[in-house]
Amino acid sequence: MAANDTIADMLTRIRNANLARHQTTQVPATKMTRSIAKVLREEGFIAEIEEAEEGVKHNLVISLKYKGKNRQPLITALKRVSKPGLRVYSNRKELPRVLGGIGIAIISTSSGIMTDREARRQNLGGEVLCYVW
């Protein structure tokens, strides 16, 4: 099934897999989902990313991380901010801080997809894609 909002689809699949305590989840591979998964891996929210091909379909297999004996998910929440019907942009001075810096905001800038911290360091603004904490 084709999704109109691949980012929301990706976040929902990760959220559902976390709630069900799955080790991995599959997400349709696009440039945007690859970039977001790469940021999540660099920030330590997910373990690893692999590419899987099933005929014509290309998927990303995302390995999730858990902590402790009870396998508590490292990702507490994922929230989509900018949506196809209502885009949310932020200039470099007004980039959001998620939970006072505990979480991250994933920003789409002219230099690619990055966290709010990286965007601040590079003095860039852009579209606020989602919050992760």
UniProtKB/Swiss-Prot annotation:
One of its GO terms (cellular component) is ribonucleoprotein complex. It comes from the Bacteria. PROSITE patterns: RIBOSOMAL_S8. InterPro entries: Ribosomal_uS8, Ribosomal_uS8_CS, Ribosomal_uS8_sf. SUPFAM superfamilies: Ribosomal protein S8 (SSF56047). GO terms for molecular function: rRNA binding; structural constituent of ribosome. The keyword RNA-binding applies. GO terms for biological process: translation. Keywords: Ribonucleoprotein, Ribosomal protein, RNA-binding, rRNA-binding. The keyword RNA-binding applies. One of the primary rRNA binding proteins, it binds directly to 16S rRNA central domain where it helps coordinate assembly of the platform of the 30S subunit. Part of the 30S ribosomal subunit. Contacts proteins S5 and S12. Belongs to the universal ribosomal protein uS8 family. This is Small ribosomal subunit protein uS8. The lineage of its organism: Bacteria, Bacillati, Cyanobacteriota, Cyanophyceae, Nostocales. The gene is rpsH.
